[in-house]
Amino acid sequence: MRKRPPFLSFALIPVIVALVLALVPTAFAGKPGGGGSSSLSLVLMDGATQAAHNGRITFNVSTTATDRPFVGLRCWQGTTWIYDAYVGYFPDAMFDPWFTLGSPSWADGIAANCTARLFYYDRRGNQKLLTTMSFPVAQ
């Protein structure tokens, strides 16, 4: 078995270092910076004192991670998934910035639990989660 000359091993070190330095910024491109912050809070609408079936809600949204934040809202009655909706919280978003808590799957007289997710879509169309919050919905 032939032994490699030692200078070849040392010659590879700068090549490996150069590759690492070139690829690391690419690997992290498009990801939010460590200094970003996000918050999400529930806002009841139409004079409501609690979130309720067929009631309207919206959210106070704040983030430095993107200028096109979305809120995805999912609700369950027990283990049954009953509601799934998405709203953009930016000026040219397609729909109104509120949710009406109702669907054909939503059973009357049964309380629900909802989880809101603040996120954005990266350049590849993947959702990037910023924060979440959960809240009960009265029957």
Language model features: what each stretch is:
Residues A11-A22:
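Bacterial N-terminal signal peptides
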Residues F28-T58, S62-T64, V137-Q139:
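Short, compositionally biased P/S/T/A/G/V-rich stretches that sit at domain boundaries
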Residues T79-T100:
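Solvent-exposed serine/threonine-rich low-complexity stretches and specific carbohydrate-binding patches
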Residues L101-G109:
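Short, surface-exposed loop/turn segments at beta-strand-coil junctions that are enriched for proline
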Residues R124-Q139:
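Short beta-strand elements
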Residues R2-I13:
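Bacterial N-terminal signal peptides that target proteins for export
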Residues G109-R123:
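Short, aromatic- and glycine-rich surface loops/edge beta-strands on solvent-exposed regions
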